[in-house]
A protein has these predicted regions:
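Short beta-strand/loop motif that positions the catalytic acidic residue
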Residues: 163-166, 170
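Short, conserved loop/helix-junction motifs that constitute active-site signature segments
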Residues: 40-43, 153-159
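Primarily recognizes the serine-hydrolase "nucleophile elbow" in alpha/beta-hydrolase
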Residues: 106-157
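Alpha/beta-hydrolase-fold catalytic nucleophile elbow
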Residues: 52, 113, 139-140, 165, ...
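Alpha/beta-hydrolase fold active-site loops
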Residues: 16, 160-161
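Short alpha-helix in the alpha/beta-hydrolase fold that links the catalytic acid
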Residues: 31-36, 150, 174-184
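Serine-hydrolase catalytic machinery in alpha/beta-hydrolase-like enzymes
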Residues: 1-111
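C-terminal catalytic histidine-bearing segment of alpha/beta-hydrolase fold enzymes
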Residues: 176-220
Length: 220
């Protein structure tokens, strides 16, 4: 299945792409407003791609159907994870990356980004993708299926530029989950740029400024 997407180009003939995944229950429109805050029109020739997650039943939501990248069985660190859901979504995100390479943007000029569920997927795909990516921005999320990463990781992205951010007052995904994920990544040799902010499960202006700095650095 090809995901429906929203695209914003900041200048003609984009030479880089940012594929940005929304959180649980949201859609691709959720992060459209951040584009002009991150890059001024004409400053860089970037293509922002905001896919819509498909609708699926979510166990944590009483089995109700909503836009989700994978099923959530529980928020406890010991809860089972939807391995099949991650793999299916991973295949869809890879299609988006390959669509960009087909349009002339090499994988090394592609950043994967995401918030909450979308951030977890971005980490999952970026660290397993067989070609070097420009980086990954994982916001208010966690590292999924950490026990599998050591055997499934792609050497091409061992040096991946990873931006992680979390809210100190996040009651939905407590910052302890983000910190544990950061520490796991570091223990596996990944370099993580970590930021934390006095916010809940959201995004704040200071974070957007740091995202801008990160993107300007990895997509010069």
């Amino acid at each position: 299945m090809t995901l429906e997407t929203i695209e914003i180009e900041t200048a003609p003939k984009p030479n880089a792409a940012v594929i940005w995944l929304h959180g649980l229950g949201a859609d691709g429109h959720d992060f459209e407003p951040v584009v002009p805050q991150i890059v001024r029109r004409g400053e860089r020739a970037w293509r922002f791609i905001f896919p819509h997650a498909p609708h699926r039943p979510v166990t944590l939501n009483g089995g109700m159907s909503m836009r989700a990248w994978y099923d959530i069985l529980g928020l406890d660190r010991t809860a089972a994870e939807d391995t099949a859901g991650f793999r299916a979504t991973d295949a869809e995100i890879r299609q988006l990356i390959e669509r960009e390479t087909g349009r002339g943007i090499p994988a090394a000029r592609v950043v994967l980004a995401g918030f909450s569920q979308g951030g977890a997927v971005s980490l999952y795909t970026a660290l397993r993708y067989p070609e070097r990516l420009a980086g990954v921005m994982a916001l208010s999320c966690y590292l999924p299926l950490p026990g599998r990463l050591s055997t499934e990781r792609a050497p091409a992205n061992d040096g991946a530029m990873i931006f992680m951010a979390h809210g100190l007052a996040d009651a939905m995904l407590p910052i302890a989950l983000g910190l544990a994920s950061r520490d796991t990544l570091k223990s596996l040799g990944y370099a993580v740029e970590w930021h934390q902010y006095p916010m809940a499960h959201s995004v704040v202006e200071a974070e957007i400024l740091h995202l801008r700095e990160f993107l300007l650095r990895v997509l010069p």
